[in-house]
């Protein structure tokens, strides 16, 4: 148990020290991953009941910005996705 806790603490310290960004738009500047980042942002906004979203630079950091939240975009139909899989 102690070893597992120590490992997790060291892993967390490494991630913080490396300044790794785990946001949905973190890889929006990589040409191949740009479309994937955009898709993840739209999905994230949809889960927040917004119509759409896009990756923007805010204060020099990639950020997912959601739009049309007042109108809502509904949820992703998880039931339909589960039935397909």
UniProtKB/Swiss-Prot annotation:
What Pfam families does its record include?
Antimicrobial25
Location in or out of the cell:
Secreted
Q: In which tissues is it expressed?
A: Expressed in the pharynx (at protein level). Detected in pharyngeal neurons and secretory cells.
**GO cellular component terms attached to this protein's record:** extracellular region
InterPro entries from the UniProt entry: Abf-1/2 (IPR031770), Abf-1/2_sf (IPR038204)
Annotated signal sequence is 1-17
In the record, biological process GO terms are: defense response to fungus; defense response to Gram-negative bacterium; defense response to Gram-positive bacterium; killing of cells of another organism
Give the propeptide segment as residue ranges.
Answer: 82-85
The record's principal subcellular location, in a coarse class, is secreted
Keywords, A to Z? Antibiotic, Antimicrobial, Fungicide, Secreted, Signal
Instruction: List all membrane-crossing ranges.
Output: none
Q: What does this gene product do? A: Exhibits antimicrobial activity against the Gram-positive bacteria B.subtilis IFO 3134, K.varians MAFF 118076 and S.aureus ATCC 6538P, the Gram-negative bacteria A.tumefaciens MAFF 1001, B.bacteriovorus MAFF 106101 and K.pneumoniae MAFF 519002, and the yeasts C.krusei MAFF 114085, K.thermotolerans MAFF 113848 and T.delbrueckii MAFF 113811.
Q: Can you say what this protein is called?
A: Antibacterial factor-related peptide 2
Which gene name does the record give? abf-2
């Amino acid at each position: 148990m102690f070893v597992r806790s120590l490992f997790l603490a060291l892993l967390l310290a490494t991630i913080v020290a490396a300044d790794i960004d785990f946001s949905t738009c973190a890889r929006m500047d990589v040409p191949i991953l740009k479309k994937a980042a955009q898709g993840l942002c739209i999905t994230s906004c949809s889960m927040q009941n917004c119509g759409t979203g896009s990756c923007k630079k805010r204060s020099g950091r990639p950020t997912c910005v959601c739009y049309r939240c007042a109108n809502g975009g509904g949820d992703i139909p998880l039931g339909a996705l589960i039935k397909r899989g």
